[in-house]
Amino acid sequence: NGLTVNKLRHAVFNFGTGNHIVFADGVNPAIIFNGTNWKEIKSSHSGGYDASNNTAGGAQAVNAPALVDIFENHVFLSGHEATRAAVAHSAPNDPYTWTAAAGAGQIAAGFDVVQIKPFRDDLFVFGNNSIKKINVNASNDFALDQVTANVGCVARDSVLEIGGDLMFLAPDGFRPVAGTSRIGDVELETVSKPIQATLVDIIKNEDMETLNGVVIRSKSQIRYFIGDSTTDASDSIGIIGGLTNSSGSIGWEFGELLGIRASCC
């Protein structure tokens, strides 16, 4: 189709029939590999696994998702440029079937979806200026609840889980989705005030689509790298954040990175 693939995202899962991996790139259909065969997920497919061809799917699928994750034994896809507010999910325990009759569906986020990430018992749906979460209600259906309409995520690949929280880059700095003592409630406090001016400048002047993030769990660190193949390595910048223990209190410290260009993490 002449479009360029800039990033490939994936999720690994096992719904009881062995390990699978599903890929999404925002240009082509999502594709699933079961260790032997590849199957494209297309909305034009009638649904289910078909050994005679290389496609699967159903009418509830989105055809060129940029985002993929696993939640409650469903494959979730989103980030299709033509339907930016749609969050699609497969039938339960069946990544190849995307028909409503089998239990697949689409959820309208109400805004352009930047990222989807499971955290505890919810699937968080990030927009540029709003955050919602998908959970399973008493009727065993997926329900969409508002988290905040006052803040969102400005960098798709900034959303990382570390230290029991879900970190993301907001317009005013890094914020964690932190669970509180009240069931179902979250906190969204800024944790990067010491470098807020630096972060605001980076957001203003850099392409957030080129941001890549990684968690270094052995060091309780997150590292973000900004820059793509068109950026000289010497001009590539980034942010490093680490959880520290000072006098029995856990907190964040941040610093700047320079000269490391990463195309993926």
What are these regions (language model features)?
Residues N1-H20:
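Blade-loop segments of beta-propeller domains
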Residues N28-K42, P171, P176-G179:
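Short, surface-exposed terminal/edge motifs of secreted or surface/virion proteins that either
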Residues N34-L67:
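Asp-box/WD-like beta-propeller blade repeats and closely related beta-sheet repeat scaffolds
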